[in-house]
């Protein structure tokens, strides 16, 4: 019916536009767009409820309130279309124009637009070169500004206070013009000549001497250039008339009881109109200046409040003391227009309900309650009912559905077939939070979810709810089925390993059936084929876990079957394996890890379809055997180790011993604390180890009656061992000891909880543990928010990283090697290069054969080849070095992790990267409290043991031999390697300064032999020569104080900070003749002492080479938890400078110390050729290099964390990327979370995409401009084509927030943060948004230029309107595992 009214309207096509521009509106523009002036503050008549004429809701200006009906009722209905009623002046048209017609208010005096005034930096202030403070004084009528100096010699734009103005008047009489308020500012802005000003400023900039002046001029120049280029006029920043929003967008809604609910805007407009009308009247009456001035100020304030309430002064509040919501507030923040309505909308055809488990569903199905389906599929049902001839009209179909007649259910079944629905669980942290399923109708009101997809949704069935959405168009159904179906999302986009893996009870069931039991029924029997095993099992002749031998093929490639040792359960499990998967994959105890591997292997060898079938069968068999096993736990399963009292007593004695050392003054309090913590941490680990050994071994009698140790079937152990539930840490607390706890401040309490939960805690122990438990819960709440915010920033910065071309043809890449930490490999090279593309041919180091040709994807088989060849380094293509101008090319990205093949064009890899990094953030934050707040802290490493036997090799180690014959390391970057006979390095360790090496070069080392040791809690200062100790500048009370320990009564000398910059506390070593001893040729044995170091020697005593003369204590350690982790990740991605960052050297060279300057130490680095570079290091910071050390560029000269900006400047992009990737990965690795490197690289690429112009050459760029790298390259190409000089620039590292805000698209930036600031800047520049990214297009309501929305795929249209039938996965032949056993 409603269509009939719009019958005469021309059909409105959606507007086709390719870009959108924002600029400042001129007063003429505002009036031109307006449909009339609003003159009165009235809204509607209180009796008739009709809009008042000329008021805020006036029908004459904004259109009729009812369709095709004028206000007075003279003209009604369609036949009078377009007539203007002569009585009330209302046009007879549809009422929806009230949503689009603007009005305006003519102001009696000009008013400044608050955005251009107060949004920092103030644009009006910048243009006129007046400070914001002065500008406000002028605008709010507290000061005068000179608008025309004429010939008085006053400067244009000088600001006078009232007194100064009177004086100036006396001095110059009326030889100049000055004014106050926005009118005066407008006069100034109008009279500005931008071209002349711009030239003058450019000259000033070249002549400027100080950096500050240059920067200030550059800022002004930027604003002026923006105005010049955009065609905006400066005076438009001052308003003469104000547009009035269409009334439907600021509605007045009658509530019951005769009251009205209104939008705050109406109040704000009313204020403006009232003050404006009063001002007009006062001006007509020629009121005194003071009164008019006050009224003008009030008008300015009213307009300010309308545009941005609370930006200046106190926010205007409504009757309920709540600040009124202004136009800016409508756009800003989470509930503003951008984020609430444009980026995410609520949709129809959706519902939500509680979820329950659906173990009998297939992987691609979900159970949908009939009630829900009936509501969701209504239009489809009506259509089918009509088609079937059950009804003739929609109305009767409606009735039929309401009555729920039997035919309706039949039709519903038919409609649902082949029509996927989307299920979504909030929070949707990654793309697997929305997946498509085929609905199966079920009774009841809860949605049934397949148990295997719970991991992806992070769902459990303790009351979680999920939403259902229905894709309507054929295109969307195809996309849902092909791209979003749960069966097509087996691999996780974050790390490329399967995410559809059995968990919890399924794991337990499969683990139980693949375990082997000693001396079970049928042990040692030999079977000719797996079928025989099945027969024997059905007959009850063999036990499920009996160890038997079967003739069969172990690998698919085997020539003929062989006898294989296995168990009954594993042979039964073999029945569900696809043929392509070798038996060896499951001929072991299947833990969760092994199951994950099985799904992975199946996906690679047998393909997607087989994997889906296998996953479903694993689910069924897992549930079945978990039920059959009937595993339960009792308190007796928590076996407390017998050795526990002994270990605790030993630890208590050690602690007492350390306490005694402390009372004797041998160690400091900090050392004592650290050692005590270490003893307890180690004891806890010992008890845990003994307990786990006990749990995992049972002693039973064999048939001969001898005792044998066999793997145990203890239920708790099985659950943890299989990976079904629980961890060693939790079992440790149940049956070992709870261990150390953390204080609220994060420090560790040095008395641990020696009891466990089985023994029960004492009151004190319980009290200590409450804190940790609560902290866990509080952390969770806080960090979920932080993690969500991190994800939001990441998505925003990476949203335009899309695969746009197949190959960019770059010749650059990254070199990747295995990651080692403390000598052990934590990530193999194979894992790091899998799915990447080789940059050059990868050659076998021995034979020289090509293992992988250049530009080829490195898949599983090639990785095996590379690892077999023993390659240490491989060059691969990387997102960081990709040369695509917009987006990224497929070759540089490599494999699409979720699909297992090279990435497709149009894939939004940036968003996937952001989700992959952000999602575990939330997971991790939610994982703190499960351990119950027990302090997890590794015992510090204090010694190195050789893992392999071989010969010791010193690499770059300077050492002296001390009196005991040990080698003491005297430099920082030395390494100790163990090499075999052929000279190949088997392992390599960095050794710290001051470490004791217990072997000599080339000495034979046995496996497990201790080769080096050091004190992890202090940094020693050692002497390199023997001699007598002499102190310099060690003056008590000035540079040193004796700290007396309250407990021990002993004193120690500690260096303190001093005001006196000339005093440099040091220890000198004198030789026999009393001169300062020399180290080598020309270095003096003089050791400077940093603040906080403890002096270990007395003056005048004799020392030997390698003796410790002073110690610098390290900070006491805090617990490592992702709490430190999440802020750490944010800090890395925000590219913040660390608090005490280390100064690094920019060149290779030799270190020397210069004279101190201004309380800072001067370090000189002298290269072989060229000038030495000097670095100033704050006093009291420990300098980690020694005189005469050789340093490489990028090495730190002092203790502290690295500053990423320095790394970029000194070592370049690749090193920076490597640093960021490694640091971020370390945080996640500590939590056991896997993320592929390429995701972090993608984000880093987005952080590095801008450059800062250093020298403009012959281009149109401005100095210090920050621009996108490809814009810079294009400008240079243009200049060089004309034979000009190219510009130079330096790489910039922007934090993710900065990078998001500096994107090309103003719509995207405005919807992210600081909306008003972004829009202000964009409108001054007259910015054009060419809608290239994802966000801008979502906001404009277009298809996004990624995935199927890419122009490449856009012209593919669905031709067939018939139902698209995609064949079902074939029913598996062997269905017996679904049937219940008789």
UniProtKB/Swiss-Prot annotation:
<feature type="binding site">
    <location>
        <position position="808"/>
    </location>
    <ligand>
        <name>Zn(2+) 2</name>
    </ligand>
</feature>
<feature type="binding site">
    <location>
        <position position="889"/>
    </location>
    <ligand>
        <name>Zn(2+) 2</name>
    </ligand>
</feature>
<keyword id="KW-0548">Nucleotidyltransferase</keyword>
<feature type="binding site">
    <location>
        <position position="88"/>
    </location>
    <ligand>
        <name>Zn(2+) 1</name>
    </ligand>
</feature>
<keyword id="KW-0460">Magnesium</keyword>
<dbReference type="GO" id="GO:0000287">
    <property type="term" value="F:magnesium ion binding"/>
</dbReference>
<keyword id="KW-0240">DNA-directed RNA polymerase</keyword>
<feature type="binding site">
    <location>
        <position position="72"/>
    </location>
    <ligand>
        <name>Zn(2+) 1</name>
    </ligand>
</feature>
<comment type="function">
    <text>DNA-dependent RNA polymerase catalyzes the transcription of DNA into RNA using the four ribonucleoside triphosphates as substrates.</text>
</comment>
<protein>
    <recommendedName>
        <fullName>DNA-directed RNA polymerase subunit beta'</fullName>
        <ecNumber>2.7.7.6</ecNumber>
    </recommendedName>
</protein>
<comment type="subunit">
    <text>The RNAP catalytic core consists of 2 alpha, 1 beta, 1 beta' and 1 omega subunit. When a sigma factor is associated with the core the holoenzyme is formed, which can initiate transcription.</text>
</comment>
<dbReference type="InterPro" id="IPR038120">
    <property type="entry name" value="Rpb1_funnel_sf"/>
</dbReference>
<dbReference type="Pfam" id="PF00623">
    <property type="entry name" value="RNA_pol_Rpb1_2"/>
</dbReference>
<dbReference type="GO" id="GO:0003677">
    <property type="term" value="F:DNA binding"/>
</dbReference>
<dbReference type="InterPro" id="IPR007066">
    <property type="entry name" value="RNA_pol_Rpb1_3"/>
</dbReference>
<keyword id="KW-0862">Zinc</keyword>
<dbReference type="Pfam" id="PF04998">
    <property type="entry name" value="RNA_pol_Rpb1_5"/>
</dbReference>
<feature type="binding site">
    <location>
        <position position="70"/>
    </location>
    <ligand>
        <name>Zn(2+) 1</name>
    </ligand>
</feature>
<feature type="binding site">
    <location>
        <position position="85"/>
    </location>
    <ligand>
        <name>Zn(2+) 1</name>
    </ligand>
</feature>
<dbReference type="InterPro" id="IPR042102">
    <property type="entry name" value="RNA_pol_Rpb1_3_sf"/>
</dbReference>
<dbReference type="GO" id="GO:0006351">
    <property type="term" value="P:DNA-templated transcription"/>
</dbReference>
<keyword id="KW-0808">Transferase</keyword>
<dbReference type="InterPro" id="IPR012754">
    <property type="entry name" value="DNA-dir_RpoC_beta_prime_bact"/>
</dbReference>
<dbReference type="Pfam" id="PF04983">
    <property type="entry name" value="RNA_pol_Rpb1_3"/>
</dbReference>
<dbReference type="Pfam" id="PF04997">
    <property type="entry name" value="RNA_pol_Rpb1_1"/>
</dbReference>
<keyword id="KW-0479">Metal-binding</keyword>
<dbReference type="InterPro" id="IPR044893">
    <property type="entry name" value="RNA_pol_Rpb1_clamp_domain"/>
</dbReference>
<dbReference type="InterPro" id="IPR007080">
    <property type="entry name" value="RNA_pol_Rpb1_1"/>
</dbReference>
<dbReference type="InterPro" id="IPR000722">
    <property type="entry name" value="RNA_pol_asu"/>
</dbReference>
<dbReference type="InterPro" id="IPR045867">
    <property type="entry name" value="DNA-dir_RpoC_beta_prime"/>
</dbReference>
<dbReference type="GO" id="GO:0003899">
    <property type="term" value="F:DNA-directed RNA polymerase activity"/>
</dbReference>
<feature type="binding site">
    <location>
        <position position="462"/>
    </location>
    <ligand>
        <name>Mg(2+)</name>
    </ligand>
</feature>
<dbReference type="GO" id="GO:0000428">
    <property type="term" value="C:DNA-directed RNA polymerase complex"/>
</dbReference>
<dbReference type="InterPro" id="IPR007081">
    <property type="entry name" value="RNA_pol_Rpb1_5"/>
</dbReference>
<keyword id="KW-0804">Transcription</keyword>
<dbReference type="Pfam" id="PF05000">
    <property type="entry name" value="RNA_pol_Rpb1_4"/>
</dbReference>
<comment type="similarity">
    <text>Belongs to the RNA polymerase beta' chain family.</text>
</comment>
<dbReference type="InterPro" id="IPR007083">
    <property type="entry name" value="RNA_pol_Rpb1_4"/>
</dbReference>
<feature type="binding site">
    <location>
        <position position="892"/>
    </location>
    <ligand>
        <name>Zn(2+) 2</name>
    </ligand>
</feature>
<feature type="binding site">
    <location>
        <position position="882"/>
    </location>
    <ligand>
        <name>Zn(2+) 2</name>
    </ligand>
</feature>
<feature type="binding site">
    <location>
        <position position="464"/>
    </location>
    <ligand>
        <name>Mg(2+)</name>
    </ligand>
</feature>
<feature type="binding site">
    <location>
        <position position="460"/>
    </location>
    <ligand>
        <name>Mg(2+)</name>
    </ligand>
</feature>
């Amino acid at each position: 019916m409603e269509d009939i009214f719009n019958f005469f309207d021309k059909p409105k096509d959606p507007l086709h536009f390719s870009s959108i521009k924002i600029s400042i509106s001129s007063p003429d523009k505002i009036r031109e767009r307006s449909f009339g002036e609003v003159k009165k503050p009235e809204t509607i008549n209180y009796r008739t409820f009709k809009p008042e004429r000329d008021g805020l809701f006036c029908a004459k200006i904004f259109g009729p309130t009812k369709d095709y009906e004028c206000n007075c009722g003279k003209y009604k209905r369609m036949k009078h279309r377009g007539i203007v009623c002569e009585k009330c002046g209302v046009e007879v048209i549809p009422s929806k124009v009230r949503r689009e017609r603007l009005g305006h208010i003519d102001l009696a005096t000009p008013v400044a637009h608050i955005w251009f005034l107060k949004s920092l930096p103030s644009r009006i202030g910048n243009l006129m070169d007046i400070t914001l403070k002065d500008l406000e004084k002028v605008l709010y009528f507290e000061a005068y500004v000179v608008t025309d100096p004429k010939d008085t010699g006053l400067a244009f734009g000088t600001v006078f206070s009232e007194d100064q103005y009177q004086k100036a008047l006396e001095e110059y009489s009326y030889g100049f013009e000055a004014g106050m308020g926005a009118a005066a500012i407008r006069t100034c802005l109008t009279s500005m000549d931008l071209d002349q000003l711009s030239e003058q400023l450019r000259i000033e900039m070249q002549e400027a001497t100080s950096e500050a002046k240059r920067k200030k001029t550059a800022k002004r120049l930027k604003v002026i250039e923006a105005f010049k280029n955009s065609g905006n006029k400066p005076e438009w920043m001052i308003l003469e008339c104000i547009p009035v929003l269409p009334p439907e967008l600021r509605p007045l809604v009658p509530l019951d009881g005769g009251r009205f609910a209104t939008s705050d805007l109406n109040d704000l407009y009313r204020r403006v109109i009232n003050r404006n009308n009063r001002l007009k009247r006062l001006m007509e009456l020629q009121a005194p200046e003071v009164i008019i001035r006050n009224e003008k100020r009030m008008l300015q304030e009213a307009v300010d409040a309308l545009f941005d309430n609370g930006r200046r002064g106190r926010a205007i509040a409504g009757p309920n003391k709540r600040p009124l919501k202004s136009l800016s507030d409508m756009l800003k923040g989470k509930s503003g227009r951008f984020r609430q309505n444009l980026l995410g909308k609520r949709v129809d055809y959706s519902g939500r309900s509680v979820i329950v488990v659906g173990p009998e569903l297939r992987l691609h199905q979900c159970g949908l309650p009939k009630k829900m389906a009936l509501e969701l599929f209504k239009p489809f049902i009506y259509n089918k009912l009509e088609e079937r001839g059950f009804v003739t009209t929609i109305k009767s179909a409606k009735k039929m559905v309401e009555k729920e007649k039997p035919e309706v259910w039949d039709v519903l079944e038919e409609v649902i077939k082949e029509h996927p629905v989307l299920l979504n669980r909030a929070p949707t942290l990654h793309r697997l939070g929305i997946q498509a399923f085929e609905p199966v109708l079920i009774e009841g009101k809860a949605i049934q979810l397949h148990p295997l997809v719970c991991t992806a949704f992070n769902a459990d069935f303790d009351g979680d709810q999920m939403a259902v959405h229905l894709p309507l168009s054929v295109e969307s159904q195809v996309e849902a089925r092909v791209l979003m179906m749960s069966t097509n999302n087996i691999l996780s986009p974050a790390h490329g390993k399967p995410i559809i893996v059995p968990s919890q009870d399924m794991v337990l069931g499969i683990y139980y059936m693949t375990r082997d039991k000693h001396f079970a029924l049928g042990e040692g029997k030999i079977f000719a084929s797996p079928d025989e095993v099945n027969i024997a099992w059905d007959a009850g002749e063999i036990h499920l876990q009996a160890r038997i031998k079967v003739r069969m093929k172990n690998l698919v490639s085997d020539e003929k079957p062989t006898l294989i040792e296995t168990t009954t359960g594993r042979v039964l499990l073999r029945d569900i394996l696809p043929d392509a998967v070798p038996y060896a994959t499951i001929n072991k105890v299947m833990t969760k890890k092994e199951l994950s591997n099985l799904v992975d292997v199946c996906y690679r060898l047998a393909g997607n379809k087989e994997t889906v079938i296998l996953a479903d069968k694993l689910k069924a068999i897992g549930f079945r055997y978990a039920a059959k096993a009937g595993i339960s736990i009792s308190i007796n399963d928590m076996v407390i180790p017998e050795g526990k009292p002994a270990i605790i007593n030993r630890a208590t004695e050690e602690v007492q011993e350390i306490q005694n050392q402390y009372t004797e003054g041998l160690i400091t309090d900090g050392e004592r604390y650290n050692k005590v913590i270490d003893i307890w941490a180690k004891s806890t680990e010992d008890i845990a180890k003994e307990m786990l050994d006990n749990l995992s071994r049972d002693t039973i009698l064999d048939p001969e009656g001898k005792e044998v140790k066999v793997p145990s079937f203890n239920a708790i152990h099985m659950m943890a061992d299989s990976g079904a539930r629980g961890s060693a840490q939790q079992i440790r607390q149940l049956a070992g000891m709870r261990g150390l706890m953390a204080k609220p401040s994060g420090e560790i309490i040095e008395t641990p909880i020696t009891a466990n939960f089985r023994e029960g805690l004492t009151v004190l122990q319980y009290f200590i543990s409450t804190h940790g438990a609560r902290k866990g819960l509080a952390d969770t709440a806080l960090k979920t928010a932080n993690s969500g915010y991190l994800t939001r920033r990441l998505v925003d910065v990476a949203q335009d990283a899309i695969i746009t071309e197949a190959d960019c043809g770059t010749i650059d890449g990254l070199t990747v090697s295995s990651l080692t930490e403390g000598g052990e490999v934590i990530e193999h090279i194979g894992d790091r290069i899998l799915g990447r593309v080789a940059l050059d041919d990868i050659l076998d180091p021995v034979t020289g054969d090509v293992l992988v040709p250049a530009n080829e994807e490195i898949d599983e088989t090639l990785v095996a080849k590379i690892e077999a060849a023993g390659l240490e380094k491989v060059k691969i293509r990387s997102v960081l070095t990709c040369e695509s101008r917009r987006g990224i090319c497929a070759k540089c990205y490599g494999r699409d992790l979720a699909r297992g093949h090279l990435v497709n064009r149009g894939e939004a890899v940036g968003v996937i990267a952001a989700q992959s990094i952000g999602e575990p953030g939330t997971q991790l934050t939610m994982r703190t409290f499960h351990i119950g707040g027990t302090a997890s802290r590794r015992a510090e490493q204090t010694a190195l043991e050789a893992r392999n036997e071989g010969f010791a090799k010193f690499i770059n180690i300077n050492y002296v031999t001390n009196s005991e014959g040990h080698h003491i390391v005297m430099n920082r970057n030395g390494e100790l390697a163990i090499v075999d006979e052929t000279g190949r390095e088997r392992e390599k360790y960095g050794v710290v300064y001051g470490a004791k090496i217990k072997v000599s070069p080339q000495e034979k080392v046995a496996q497990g032999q201790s080769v080096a040791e050091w004190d992890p809690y202090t940094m020693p200062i050692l002497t390199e020569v023997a001699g007598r100790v002499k102190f310099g500048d060690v003056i008590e009370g000035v540079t040193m104080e004796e700290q007396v320990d309250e407990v021990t009564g002993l004193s120690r000398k500690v260096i303190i900070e001093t005001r006196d910059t000339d005093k440099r506390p040091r220890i000198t070593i004198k030789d026999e003749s009393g001169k300062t001893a020399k180290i080598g040729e020309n270095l003096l044995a003089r050791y400077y002492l940093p603040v906080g170091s403890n002096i270990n020697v007395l003056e005048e005593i004799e020392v030997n080479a390698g003796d410790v003369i002073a110690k610098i204590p390290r900070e006491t350690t805090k617990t490592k938890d992702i709490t430190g982790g999440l802020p750490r990740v944010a800090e890395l991605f925000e590219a913040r400078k660390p608090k005490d960052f280390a100064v690094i050297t920019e060149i290779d060279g030799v270190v020397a110390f210069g004279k101190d300057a201004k309380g800072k130490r001067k370090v000189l680095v002298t290269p072989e050729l060229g000038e030495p570079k000097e670095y100033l290091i704050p006093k009291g910071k420990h300098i980690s290099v020694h005189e005469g050390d050789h340093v490489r560029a990028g090495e730190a000269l002092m203790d502290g964390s690295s500053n990423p900006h320095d790394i970029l400047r000194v070592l370049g992009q690749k090193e920076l990327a490597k640093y960021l990737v490694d640091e971020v990965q370390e945080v996640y690795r500590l939590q056991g979370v896997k993320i592929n490197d390429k995701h972090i690289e993608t984000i880093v690429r987005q952080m590095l995409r801008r450059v800062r112009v250093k020298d403009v050459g012959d281009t149109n760029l401005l100095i210090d401009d920050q621009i996108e790298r490809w814009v810079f390259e294009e400008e240079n190409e243009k200049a060089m084509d004309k034979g000009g000089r190219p510009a130079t620039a330096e790489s910039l590292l922007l934090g993710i927030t900065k990078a998001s805000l500096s994107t090309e698209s103003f719509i995207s930036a405005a919807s992210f943060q600081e909306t008003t600031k972004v829009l202000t800047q964009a409108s001054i520049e007259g910015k054009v948004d060419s809608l290239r990214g994802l966000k801008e297009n979502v906001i404009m309501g277009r298809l996004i230029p990624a995935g199927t929305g890419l122009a490449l795929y856009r012209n593919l249209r669905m031709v067939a309107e018939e139902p698209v039938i995609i064949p079902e996965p074939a029913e598996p032949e062997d269905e017996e595992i679904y049937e219940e056993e008789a």
